[in-house]
Amino acid sequence: MTKAPLHKSLYVQVLAAIVIGVVLGHFYPPSGEAMKPLGDGFIKLIKMIIAPVIFCTVVLGIAGMEDMKKVGKTGGLALLYFEIVSTLALIVGLVLVNVLQPGAGMNIDPRTIDTKAITAYTGPGKMTGTVEFLLNIIPVSMVDAFAKGDILQVLLISVLFGFALHRFGGRGTMVFDFIEKVSQVLFAIVGTIMKAAPIGAFGAMAFTIGKYGIGSLLSLGKLMGTFYLTCLFFIFAVLGTITRLHGFSVWKFVKYIKEELLIVLGTSSSESVLPRMLSKMENLGAKKTVVGLVIPTGYSFNLDGTAIYLTMAAVFIAQATNTPMTLMQEVTLLAVLLLTSKGAAGITGSGFIVLAASLSAVGHLPVAGLALILGIDRFMSEARALTNTIGNGVASIVVAKWSKELDEQRLHAQLNGQTAEEASAPQALPDRMESRIHH
């Protein structure tokens, strides 16, 4: 099969766009800042399509299943995996920040820190308790969930709709076929939007460098380096071990989603590739039901990069302000973050809000220390988003294997590059709905 010219590869186009964005932002900062609408516009286009894509994917997956008990089993296995791996991420961040000590020697007095920037950044949002978080999953109305684009609310509606459609049996064939056609149209729209990915990546990167400057990285470079190193360690050591135990390579997996990772790098948003990740995980052999449940849910419960960031940032603040922490206090911090990290999605300024709430709950760490990392948070968000994206992708394959809903032959064929299906098109739907109806 003849390969497309290099310049037509989305991977090459996005990479070139990021480089051009960095150059423009560095040498012409005002022009770089002016490119912000390009990045914002691309992310809004993607967010526009996320809710209906999730709805169609989950409904078709559940309605087409013969054994409905598998849906509950898959959901339970997914939550178990999320809890184990996100806990590992918190522990990895805690251990490495203690070993590398990026904040040691800064000797900053918390009383001298200007906290106005923190108030401005975290003011619009607030942390919610566990009960309120769970109640917020139930939308005011079905229309409201889609209007707000709340992923968990849309997921709840999709699961209920899928179960109801399944119970209709043959009477639901017309609705099933209609949703299938809508799904195909939606993925065609996704393919069209993704052609603008280089423009979005260029705009977002030009703005970031133009506004904050490459020089702003140098002052807190040790923390940046430690965080990126920890994320790499987590991906290739922790997730690498998990993938090896489940029969595939994390290196090949990362290579398989390289285009999506470049888009995430350019936009600093893991949501920007959610529709493509749904499609690509299906193309790897994971069943639609598993992918439709695991990927969207992972955006709230499996934020590995965010978990690493939370422990590292908290201990960094303690080190920088010479605030001593005993082993018991670090264990307490870990326990608090196990709870608060689950509310890190869907909130404006979520990283700082969750971190501020956690520092307040622990009690002995200065919340004012958040101002130390505010300036470089935008650069750290890229590593968070990349780690979150890879983590959720791996989760969908692992949970699919646990649920016996994974075509392993297809998985290895795709990862070894033996097939060249377009990721922008959804995997052909199985004939389970048809066979179930005729039975």
From Swiss-Prot:
Protein origin, superkingdom: Bacteria
GO cellular component term, pick one: plasma membrane
Gene Ontology terms, MF aspect: fumarate transmembrane transporter activity; malate:proton symporter activity; succinate transmembrane transporter activity
Transmembrane segments: 10-30, 45-65, 77-97, 145-165, 185-205, 223-243, 290-310, 332-352, 353-373
InterPro entries cross-referenced by the UniProt entry: C4_dicarb_transport (IPR023954), Na-dicarboxylate_symporter (IPR001991), Na-dicarboxylate_symporter_CS (IPR018107), Na:dicarbo_symporter_sf (IPR036458)
Topological relation to the membrane, as annotated: Multi-pass membrane protein
Compartment list: Cell inner membrane
Cross-referenced PROSITE patterns: NA_DICARBOXYL_SYMP_1 (PS00713), NA_DICARBOXYL_SYMP_2 (PS00714)
HAMAP family: C4_dicarb_transport
Family: Belongs to the dicarboxylate/amino acid:cation symporter (DAACS) (TC 2.A.23) family.
Name of the protein in its database record: C4-dicarboxylate transport protein
Name of the gene encoding the protein in the UniProt record: dctA
